[in-house]
């Protein structure tokens, strides 16, 4: 197991002993026709023996707040941060030459990863047998990300008809795009909207209904084994 997450500016690097991995850093990722430097930092969860890889870029992730400014307004570049994160994760996995059995997506910031895996990285032999699972949570933000998100994703050669949900890039539509391009879905919240619940059921994807805290570990393991591995 390896964990990948953005290196948000409110993460204390000294306390969590993050350090840059030079051999993984240094490449540029193109986001909306602009080269953005990728920095990879790593820390570990010693008791669990799990490595955590932090996808970093000064312009996208140095700010102290996570998704919104002091007024609670969404950052205008959240869409580009999501594109950068999706590409950054896959490029890092490629550099590690690690073959994941499952990529498990959590949260809307990672929701474009299944889209990029199915189109932008479709010819990567490393991922030929990798399955993608999306965990769906309740409403995470109000309003829309940048209305140009669909065009920015299309710039990477992803067909517009595959991402038509992103025409209105609200939370629910971004999650729908993730579900559509995943191999399976896990309902991770009791607070899903009826429309999102209906969408998951109608997607014909294998899905695991919500499981309580005392049961979810066993439920996830069984789901992985039966549906994916």
What label would you give each PLM region?
Residues 1-229:
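Catalytic cores of nucleotide-sugar-dependent glycosyltransferases that transfer UDP/GDP/TDP-activated
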């Amino acid at each position: 197991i390896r964990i990948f997450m953005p290196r948000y500016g409110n993460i204390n690097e000294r306390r969590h002993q993050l350090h840059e991995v030079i051999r993984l850093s240094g490449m540029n990722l193109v986001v909306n026709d602009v080269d953005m430097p990728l920095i990879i930092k790593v820390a570990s969860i010693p008791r669990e023996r799990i490595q955590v890889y932090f996808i970093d870029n000064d312009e996208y992730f140095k700010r102290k707040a996570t998704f919104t400014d002091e007024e609670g307004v969404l950052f205008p570049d959240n869409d580009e941060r999501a594109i950068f994160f999706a590409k950054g994760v896959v490029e890092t996995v490629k550099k590690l030459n690690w073959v994941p059995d499952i990529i498990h997506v959590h949260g809307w910031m990672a929701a474009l990863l299944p889209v990029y895996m199915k189109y932008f990285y479709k010819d990567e032999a490393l991922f030929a047998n990798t399955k993608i699972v999306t965990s769906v949570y309740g409403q995470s933000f109000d309003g829309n990300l940048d209305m140009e998100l669909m065009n920015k994703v299309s710039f990477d050669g992803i067909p517009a008809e595959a991402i038509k949900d992103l025409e209105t890039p609200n939370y629910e539509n971004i999650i729908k795009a993730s579900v559509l391009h995943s191999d399976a879905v896990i309902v991770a919240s009791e607070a899903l909207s009826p429309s999102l619940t209906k969408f998951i059921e109608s997607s014909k994807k294998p899905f695991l209904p919500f499981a309580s805290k005392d049961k979810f570990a066993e439920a996830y393991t069984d789901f992985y084994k039966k549906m994916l591995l």
